[in-house]
Amino acid sequence: MSKLTQNWNRRRFLGAMGGAAGLLILKDARSARSYQANEKLRVAAVGIGGMGAWNLAHIAGENVEFLPTRMLIKPATQPVMTGENIVALCDVDDRTTATSAPDRRNPPGETFARYPQAKRYFDYRRMLEEMDDQIDAVVVSTPDHLHAPISLAAMRRGKHVYCEKPGAHSVMEGRLMGQVAAEKGVATQLGTQIHASENYRRVVELLRGGAIGAVEECHIWPRGAGIAPSERPKETPPVPAALHWEQFLGPTRYRPYHPVYSRGCGGNWQRWWDFGNGNLGNMGGHFFNLAFWALELRHPLSVETEGPPPHPETTPAQLHVRYKFPARGSLPPVTLTWTHGSEPPRIFAENKFPDWAWGVFRGTEGMLLVNYDRWMLWPERKFAKFVAPAPSIPPSIGLEITRRAEWIAAYRALLPGQGLAEFGHRMEWIAACKTGSPTACNFGYSGAIMETINLGAAAYRAGTRLDWDAANLRVTNAPQANALLSRPYRPGWGM
């Protein structure tokens, strides 16, 4: 395999895990260590620009005003939250300015300066080795190709992990994330922050309560196309002094530096297969999460895709993915579709849904339109006299922590239905680290979402429908596609 090592093919994976029967562990892991009521977690963070800086600000109780794509106004009376102890920061980039929109308000260099007490690293492996006995928990906010390697390395050392979505860059990585979290007894949370929102809870209650009858379909259309495919650049400009290119590449195959791969340099790593899975990998975690929760989905039976011919280097600008899920107890089989690009799915094209709706659940008695912060029963006339049931799903533990008048007044007015959820989701993880309380998006639950997203990408790249044997982690109808379930790792970066 030239210079690459295939560390986790299916046979070795199943062998290391003791066979397939023990893989589906759904319970949330309990904290491996007990904490005094006022004791601070010792937190390390890997990936501290962009969303990483925002994750840190919440966990450390920092009074900052930025968020990628949004600005928040800090209330004058804002209390410091639990204010965890930030002991180590790791990023491959320490520039103090950035050229792309997502990172321009919080480049890594500024985050390093914001926490001067934290020890600084550029290689997460060295950080975990040198500070093993000084770190309790790790926050991972890197490009997608590093999510699982860092999270797994931390969990194997007994560290609690909060990882941004999607959490895995291959099907096998998604399975392994849930398995190792359960084996090590650590608290985990995938960064699908909207799971903590009141709106998602109301949608789950409506669907499980039979508001639209038996749900047979869910269609997701986040609108917006990806970037048109392109070839790998031939130019090899010098690596910026502030960028550690080898550490940026991490486990993925070597390629010379070019700014198109680095968001901090004005590029977009998400569109390159070696670093991400495009729109599906970027946003699928948020959108699939609601369907998995409400409909009790786990593993699809099959997946097929439609789109332009697969490009070997870059992800597609348009893509349609169709998953078939089996019946679950009394719940009927479900078709789940994902579409990104300018052409809407048929159900959106045939109905005059409001522009805010990115998802629709179709049941035997009607439809339910959804977004992060609202829902609507459809057709409106049929449900004009519908009265929603009283809330029955308790608020997120973390959301309860943040329910203080100062926060509610400042953030709920600015980001209806979202501001508090973002805080609550992270505080839920903090509570789990300290007390062993459950997290809603622990890797036992969210690992199946990671697998499903990556299986869709594999089906597209394989160019054929995949019939999926989840218990044995294999494609049954197209054996050649099994090579796409894992990825090669460079020596020294394997899992």
Give residue spans per PLM region:
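Short, solvent-exposed turn/loop segments enriched in Gly/Ser/Thr/Pro and often Arg
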Residues: D93-T96, Y121, S141-H147, G167-H169, ...
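Extracellular/periplasmic catalytic domains that process cell-envelope and extracellular macromolecules
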Residues: Q36-N38, P79-T82, A113, M131-D133, ...
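N-terminal glycine-/serine-/threonine-rich beta1-alpha1-beta2 phosphate-ribose binding loop
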Residues: S2-K159, M172-A187
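A contiguous active-site-proximal alpha/beta segment in oxidoreductase catalytic domains
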Residues: H160-Y162, G167-G250
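Contiguous beta-strand/loop segments that form the cofactor/metal-binding neighborhood of enzyme cores
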Residues: R202, G213-G444, M450-M495
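Structural recognition of the beta-strand scaffold that forms the well-ordered cores
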Residues: V43-A45, V87-C90, V139-V140, Y162-C163, ...
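Alpha-helical packing segments of well-folded alpha/beta enzyme cores
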Residues: N55, T96, I150, E173, ...
